């Protein structure tokens, strides 16, 4: 995968979709979208969406702004809005992708500029157990329909972003 024609790189809401997020955030398994595309997602960007991926098992390669990164079990991938990225996962890779709109990011990060700086950097880093637990909670809540779901998702999003910022800081 190469990014030689940066002007020709597609911008998506979610890969292959053009509509905006209909929910507080979006969360899906890595396999859900990747398996449909033979485990390879071509270079693209999300102009108003921040993505956090967590590889539970399997692996592959991530391309972030033209730099190649190996993916491994326990890998956290931070993809800020506007950054070009592509993935080639090994078949049957398991994990999650959480997608947060800029508006939610702004709401959560209103008074924490240092955290915003950490999250503004695309990177692959080892996930902490706390981050993995937060991502699992986001997935469970997103998949359910319990009372106060939107409120809980907002809170879990803030927690997840906090753990991502810590991982980015440790990885720096």
What are these regions (language model features)?
Residues 81-104:
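Ligand-binding loop in jelly-roll beta-barrel domains
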